[in-house]
Regions:
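Rossmann-like NAD(P) dinucleotide-binding subdomain of oxidoreductase/dehydrogenase enzymes
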Residues: 1-116
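ALDH superfamily catalytic-core signature
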Residues: 72, 78-205
Length: 205
């Protein structure tokens, strides 16, 4: 997802209204949270107001969401993890705010603006396709179905994967080998279930 954005959306409002908090960032993307913690320390916040704890969800996350001193949990992540957090929170009626996986769709009619198809595809690819609010499918008017396929094929094949620190018109890799393998599994499943692959494919998400 968007590590610094997600962290700030949760941390800043909580601190602004006088709450104390514990932040556990994703174990795959902790650096933004560490930088923020250093800034908060430089700003001389009282000790204990903001607390950073690193670790994975299965151990650290489980311990935090089960702890009796935690009154509210705000979580952005997978539906599976959200269900586990809800179970922990229910034991002592913690308040919970969950932002979980979505299944957004693009809907494009014949009279849509000329760049609607490409813009919809861009929203899928943005952040290397790792945004929880990225569209997952496109529904197009039947009369322009073939045109939409060709335009999407051309647009998708123009994308290149390269070093995210370099400037240029490319996207970075996904965050981990585990995520890459998950994508490969989903591509294969789609093909096995009858999907017509027109861009990318096995080994090249």
């Amino acid at each position: 997802n968007w590590p610094m954005n997600q962290v700030c959306l949760k941390v800043i409002p909580a601190l602004a209204v006088g709450c104390t908090m514990v932040l556990k960032p994703s174990e795959l993307a902790p650096l933004s949270a560490i930088v923020l913690a250093e800034l908060i320390d430089e700003a001389k916040f009282p000790k204990g107001v903001f607390n950073l704890v690193n670790g994975d969800g299965a151990t650290t996350g489980d311990a935090l969401t089960s702890h009796s001193d935690v009154n509210m949990i705000s979580f952005t992540g997978s539906t599976r993890a959200g269900a586990l957090i809800s179970q922990n929170a229910a034991k002592d009626f913690k308040r919970v705010s969950l932002e979980l996986g979505g299944k957004g769709a693009n809907i494009v009619f014949k009279d849509a603006d000329p760049e609607a198809i490409e813009r919809g595809a861009l929203r899928c690819f943005r952040n290397s396709g790792q945004s929880c609010n990225a569209p997952t499918r496109m529904l197009v008017e039947k009369s322009m179905y073939s045109e939409a396929i060709e335009r999407l094929k051309k647009y998708a094949n123009e994308f290149k994967v390269d070093d995210p620190n370099k400037e240029g018109e490319h996207i970075g890799p996904v965050i981990s080998e585990t995520q890459y393998n998950k994508i490969q599994t989903l591509i294969k499943k789609g093909i096995d279930e009858g999907a017509n692959l027109v861009a990318g494919g096995p080994g090249k998400p």
